[in-house]
Amino acid sequence: MSKNYHIAVLPGDGIGPEVMAQALKVMDAVRSRFDMRITTSHYDVGGIAIDNHGHPLPKATVEGCEQADAILFGSVGGPKWENLPPESQPERGALLPLRKHFKLFSNLRPAKLYQGLEAFCPLRADIAANGFDILCVRELTGGIYFGQPKGREGSGQYEKAFDTEVYHRFEIERIARIAFESARKRRRKVTSIDKANVLQSSILWREIVNDVAKTYPDVELAHMYIDNATMQLIKDPSQFDVLLCSNLFGDILSDECAMITGSMGMLPSASLNEQGFGLYEPAGGSAPDIAGKNIANPIAQILSLALLLRYSLDANDAATAIEQAINRALEEGVRTGDLARGAAAVSTDEMGDIIARYVAEGV
């Protein structure tokens, strides 16, 4: 008998409800094809939660997420709420507290150049022709963004500002394990990014990653300095499988990876804790300018569901089926407006219907 799973669904604002509806169509197809018992509960978050409950992250939403196996998150924010105090705005008042509450220490950002979309890649045509499929694994809760001391002091010519890069062994070990486990589900190569020729924190990072690698003899490990990595991503992104990064370096490289795909509408994201509980969301924003027009690209939201299946439910076959269905749709020329470039475009609903049908049929 299959296990029962429960997903907290937080559509949010802007295009969030529209693209979430498409992911739920695909979830229905997964249920049927793979005989998975998945139930869902919907909760307000972000601006809609401010309107309905007076807070971007209501207590009921947090409690609902605590009862779930994973969170499928849409997007939050919009002009309506941008004049609120920063801590009360949808982005800072909802997403960041969720990450903190559930101790989500790792961020996974896949970046893939799909066949047929090479023209959107800003790299040279001969580089884009090779394609790429990269997973950026970023440590989220340590490093220079959170290290102490930090601050400003002094005045005049003696005024200064300072931040501190701090990493503990356990923080490096657990993010390294995420990277190596992820590589086992992919092409079995990890490239660890550091600045070990200069920084003490990077020297420790490299030492510990080497130690963790000994328990993954089936996964290839390489090390690369951050400055070289930024260049190599432009020169030949196809050389990379899994990038393992500290908070700062991952912040930089995950955005670079996103940029070279050419479309934010294709990029999912996962944030995980040590128990495998995760929050899954599109990497793009709420796009209020196109909300309600049925033209948004739902693929990032659907791919976020695929990540949820793979990492929180350990349903790799179902995740792969979604990815194959998306590949098929794109190879057949199915495009939403952001990818059409003047050609015929399908609506948000139509794209969701097509992908769900392809999941149900199998490729």
UniProtKB/Swiss-Prot annotation:
EC numbers: 1.1.1.85
UniProt xrefs under PROSITE patterns: IDH_IMDH
Identify the taxonomic lineage of the organism of origin: Bacteria, Pseudomonadati, Pseudomonadota, Gammaproteobacteria, Enterobacterales
| Cofactor(s) recorded in Swiss-Prot or TrEMBL | Mg(2+); Mn(2+)
Which sites bind NAD(+)?
A: 78-91, 285-297
Enumerate the catalysed reactions.
(2R,3S)-3-isopropylmalate + NAD(+) = 4-methyl-2-oxopentanoate + CO2 + NADH
Which InterPro entries did the record assign?
IsoCit/isopropylmalate_DH_CS, IsoPropMal-DH-like_dom, Isopropylmalate_DH
- Protein name in the entry: 3-isopropylmalate dehydrogenase
Gene Ontology cellular component terms for the protein in this record: cytosol
What is this protein's function per UniProt?
A: Catalyzes the oxidation of 3-carboxy-2-hydroxy-4-methylpentanoate (3-isopropylmalate) to 3-carboxy-4-methyl-2-oxopentanoate. The product decarboxylates to 4-methyl-2 oxopentanoate.
Task: Please state where this protein is localized.
Answer: Cytoplasm
